């Protein structure tokens, strides 16, 4: 599996509760926090849901 580098680039303030929960499930709690999960279908679905808040790169 490929690894992804996901960075939160926009604030979670004022977002829908399920979008905040999705970001927290990915481990993204603060702006500019970065995580490197495996590119599983579950993670890709979470990214698609909140892609307007993220910067995603393949590692």
Swiss-Prot record:
InterPro entries: Ribo_uL30_ferredoxin-like_sf, Ribosomal_uL30_bac-type, Ribosomal_uL30_ferredoxin-like. The keyword Ribonucleoprotein applies. GO terms for cellular component: cytosolic large ribosomal subunit. Pfam families: Ribosomal_L30. GO terms for molecular function: structural constituent of ribosome. GO terms for biological process: translation. Gene3D superfamilies: Ribosomal protein L30, ferredoxin-like fold domain (3.30.1390.20). Keywords: Ribonucleoprotein, Ribosomal protein. HAMAP family: Ribosomal_uL30_B (MF_01371_B). PANTHER family: LARGE RIBOSOMAL SUBUNIT PROTEIN UL30M, MITOCHONDRIAL RIBOSOMAL PROTEIN L30. Belongs to the universal ribosomal protein uL30 family. Part of the 50S ribosomal subunit. This is Large ribosomal subunit protein uL30. The gene is rpmD.
